[in-house]
Amino acid sequence: IAAVIILLIALLVVAIGVKVSSDRRARNLGLDGTKSSEVIASKLVDNAENSSVRIYVERGVIADEKHYSIEMTISANTRTIRVLRGYENIEEKSEGLSNNLEAYRAFLKALEKNDFTEIREDTSGFEFRAACPTERSYRFSLMEGSSETFDRWFTFCDGKRFGEYGGKVNATFSLFKNQFPNYGMITRGVSF
């Protein structure tokens, strides 16, 4: 009996050691959902061939018929802008442009300079649309292959910042907007 108890204790110790080691590995690789901004930032340019970045901007909470949002997605091969109507994101207009790896790498480096992957703590408890319902809201995403590895939001009202996105919002928005020579024409009639 003593041998069985010692064997069970030894197995338990090994199992706990494996779990702790696995948790540390996941945290270091960012697989546990708590990726540090340093880990994500280093991956922006390093994984340019297999990634895309996206910004989604929407108007405050208003009638479905007047609710518009803009989504811009950039990858090594394409740049896409979509104007979406209503809360169900019905596509009204879109434009797809080609891209190349060097242009995309330059874009990612510019995003890094503007803290695209910076994460800030938001203890407000609000969600994306609830924090500042009459103001513009932003979502920033990084996709690696088919996996979304970074998704943070931001809004500002009453002198307060809300959301987990810690980057430079206006500069980042301008960088995305400048990827589309026809931005003004595509978004004509969309009021924020």
Show the residue positions of the predicted features.
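Extracytoplasmic/periplasmic/luminal assembly and interaction segments
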Residues: K43-E102
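Short, well-ordered, aromatic-rich surface patches in folded extracellular/luminal domains
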Residues: L11-I62, S124-F192
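Short, surface-exposed linear patches
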Residues: N77, E95, I119-E121, F162-Y165
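Hydrophobic H-region at the start of alpha-helical membrane spans
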Residues: A2-A10
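A mature extracytoplasmic/lumenal domain signature
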Residues: R85-Y87, L111, E144-S146
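Long, charged/polar, surface-exposed segments that mediate recognition or autoinhibition
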Residues: I90-D122
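Short, surface-exposed, polar/charged, turn-prone segments marking secondary-structure boundaries
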Residues: R82-V83, K109-E112, G125, V169-A171
